[in-house]
Amino acid sequence: MKKNTDSEMDQRLGYKFLVPDPKAGVFYRPLHFQYVSYSNFILHRLHGILTVKRPLLSFKNNTERIMIEISNVKVTPPDYSPIIASIKGKSYDALATFTVNIFKEVMAKEGISITKISSYEGKDSHLIKIPLLIGYGNKNPLDTAKYLVPNVIGGVFINKQSVEKVGINLVEKITTWPKFRVVKPNSFTFSFSSVSPPNILPTRYRHYKISLDISQLEASNISSTKTFITVNIVLLSQYLSRVSLGFIRRSLSYDMPPEVVYLVNAIIDSAKRLTESITDFNIDTYINDLVEAEHVKQKSQLTINEFKYEMLHNFLPHMNYTPDQLKGFYMISLLRKFLYCIYYTSRYPDRDSMVCHRILTYGKYFETLAHDELENYIGNIRNDIMNNHKNRGTYAVNIHVLTTPGLNHAFSSLLSGKFKKSDGSYRTHPHYSWMQNISIPRSVGFYPDQVKISKMFSVRKYHPSQYLYFCSSDVPERGPQVGLVSQLSVLSSITNILTSEYLDLEKKICEYIRSYYKDDISYFETGFPITIENALVASLNPNMICDFVTDFRRRKRMGFFGNLEVGITLVRDHMNEIRINIGAGRLVRPFLVVDNGELMMDVCPELESRLDDMTFSDIQKEFPHVIEMVDIEQFTFSNVCESVQKFRMMSKDERKQYDLCDFPAEFRDGYVASSLVGINHNSGPRAILGCAQAKQAISCLSSDIRNKIDNGIHLMYPERPIVISKALETSKIAANCFGQHVTIALMSYKGINQEDGIIIKKQFIQRGGLDIVTAKKHQVEIPLENFNNKERDRSNAYSKLESNGLVRLNAFLESGDAMARNISSRTLEDDFARDNQISFDVSEKYTDMYKSRVERVQVELTDKVKVRVLTMKERRPILGDKFTTRTSQKGTVAYIADETELPYDENGITPDVIINSTSIFSRKTISMLIEVILTAAYSAKPYNNKGENRPVCFPSSNETSIDTYMQFAKQCYEHLNPKLTEKELSDKIFCEKILYDPETDKPYASKVFFGPIYYLRLRHLTQDKATVRCRGKKTKLIRQANEGRKRGGGIKFGEMERDCLIAHGAANTITEVLKDSEEDYQDVYICENCGDIAAQIKSINTCLRCSKLNLSPLLTKIDTTHVSKVFLTQMNARGVKVKLDFERRPPSFYKPLDKVDLKPSFLK
């Protein structure tokens, strides 16, 4: 639609990132990071986790040890790559086996003697079975343990076995920045976690807390429950770093505001007073005394030297092999941040900032579970050895303990949405839209309990750190997660790195840092600490920081370190730190590089001419300084210009202040938001509502729906959208389709299409317009004896079953039909009965309102009979079904009109859908009109000048003016018919047509907006929601219809329904519905003295209140509703007295009788 010019180079570069890049192994960009994460776990990480050699038990001062060794770990993946298998949708199933050896080591003078205790060589191919990434279910179609109808080649597929079901990427609870917290006025804490590097297994975790109370500065301590002593933070830093208190004072005070310097002096002085209060103070003796006290307190079995070594050696596991002196300098840098944060809290990354968090991808889920289950497995072996030694006096292990690692059960729980035992459940995949196959694996969310604790986590605010990396439009509009920003933007991805790559990268970076002059990287007193994954490695001369960071970034882009996703962050603002991040789980995305005030894209003249023939990896190799992969921490502490256009309008001095420049606005949306059109031309809420509706659109889910026993709704005749964005095309959402093109007219139709009502053409429905097929899984578990029982009295519910007790293939199920035989029987304890066996049907019935055809039946025979039935039903649009455009103009079918009832144009064409025209103005969806105009222009000229079919690019967010799109439409029509007059051309551009009244055949006075648009059918279907019924079950308490369609529920008749009938004056109807039916009628006796409801004691009605006072009141019988009685009883139980009083008045239908005077007449 638009020519590629120099001003659009940024857009073309952004598109290059989205398309596949086979040279770099990227075949599908949206989920590439998930594929790599999963592949790394199977091919590399699992082997390292399972390879273990460690002591289980030790005796006699560690001279005798029971050892466990897991070796010969063999992971058997298929012949093809996990990534290729994922894209092709093939079943990826990796199997792992290993050998366990348990032996006893005895240390003697002659040496170490080894005695074998037990051994298990895992030859079972299913010892550890890693589930599928993408692909469904049963590999063996002729499995004898399963009964299958029809038993065709291809088997039956159960979606539950796919990792695709897992759901969102969880944010790790451990933060990479310490968490600052105000406990109370003038009292603060600084909590941080230390996790060992990925090459150290099992992973060691330590959590520390620094406390500071202004009123008790001597108690400024660092502590960790059971893993470290409680000690003054300044003295600990001095002990580790071996420097004076003056050195620490100068280090903390350097480049700090005056108020922070004052607090630094106070803390150092308090530490000095603490040392002076102890006679002959020695820092080593002081720490040793604290360690000994902690040893006694914990009642440790270790010797004091072993205990001290264990505590101090494991202090700060992330700096495991680092000298104590660097650990001390690291503690000083932490204390520096802490003191600064007290005064300038808003400038420090808070706990909600994505800067502080790493993200768990699919491979990381499996890795975490493998760690946990391996520890459980080893723990079970240890306990079994101890129990056998205690009971039998021998070191032995039961074989069933060795053969059940427990990983398979943990992986199975993960696929059900359960991640770890302590973390609760989280949402898994629904199956309504193909778009959700992409959107959910790219969603980032907090743990469920973190979402609920709103006091701790303000996750419902659009945090500044989420800008550009997350989609601001695709957020829930209602429910418990309303406003939760979770969807990644199209350019964002999550880093993955192998352990070997991690160690090599760390080594290269350290070598580069140490290539600087020794004195320049040893400024530990007043320099900028350099950390790699929070581990301190050097401290840089403050005069060299800018040159160091600039040179590091240039070398990174040129591939000097062998990894283009390294993050380097220069933290200024008095915190003074250079942070280098290389680990997995970081959010990264590309940015355009600005170097010394120049946009590097502009200084590469060859780039534009060669760009069409290059992939993204080619650009990174041949033009390394044009684009840089930046993680979210580096972005937060960098100066980023929001657009190339804005950057070019700045002066040269202003440009030099920037480090990076962003891509156009369309790349800030997620893939769901990219399916919308022109959201920046509409009102803001339309984007949020549009994303929600797009995910509810019914699409073409799978080409193998007949073999996949799973719920799903599938569009029968999908069409590829004409108006699309590049992200929609590269993600294959457009190719998989999620709607159809229909002809709409914006007008009023006999007052029927008010509000959200739409008119739909009957012939359009009959031709298969927006027709769908519903696939539904019905699953029942039946006890084996019930399944084998025979029915004594023939039941209509079993009319669709075959002699084997299963529903017949191709049978049409109606409401009330059983899907499998389930007959329960009992024996009566009656010696005189001829037949003391009674049986009754307890089968689960088909409950849907519509008939469905049985497509497939599967049975698993174990201790219970598991029956799975797949039913299919074609469902055409009916009254009440929901539809929408891609601009959130939803509509509900209000009337299905015959073609003869609809207006027509000069060619006799009638609209498929009529939409209320006022909805455009009230919802401000201008882009809906633009979409119609562009789709109509495409129909006039569907090919470009080279004769190739081309869709129209109308991105979700764009800076293109509406006039540009109008000019494009004008050129299309002029190309088709150059002789059009200005008026005719204007009508065609703006899709205005004269329509004729079908009743009078006369033209309407005004022109009507009439044209094609991409229309979506939503999964909100009338027959799935309708619960209205005249008769049926009611609840015992309130005598209203029970809830739930599966239980035959109905709609409750509540206050609003009552008010409607009152407004219509239908008093008798209210009486009939709420009172006169036999279920609701209730006789109640009321005490006329106190107004209480009488109680029934031994069939005698008595007023309890009056009987205690020895009164004999009059009880009056009234008829009321059962609900009224329940209401009064519940109010009384809550201490609220409701008195029923009787009104004293004469009958309303008779006048008072005339008085009769009985006096004798002579007395009158």
Curated annotation (Swiss-Prot):
GO terms for molecular function: DNA binding; DNA-directed RNA polymerase activity; metal ion binding; ribonucleoside binding. It is found in: Virion. The keyword Transcription applies. GO terms for biological process: DNA-templated transcription. GO terms for cellular component: DNA-directed RNA polymerase complex; virion component. It catalyses: RNA(n) + a ribonucleoside 5'-triphosphate = RNA(n+1) + diphosphate. Belongs to the RNA polymerase beta chain family. This is DNA-directed RNA polymerase 133 kDa polypeptide. It comes from Variola virus (isolate Human/India/Ind3/1967).
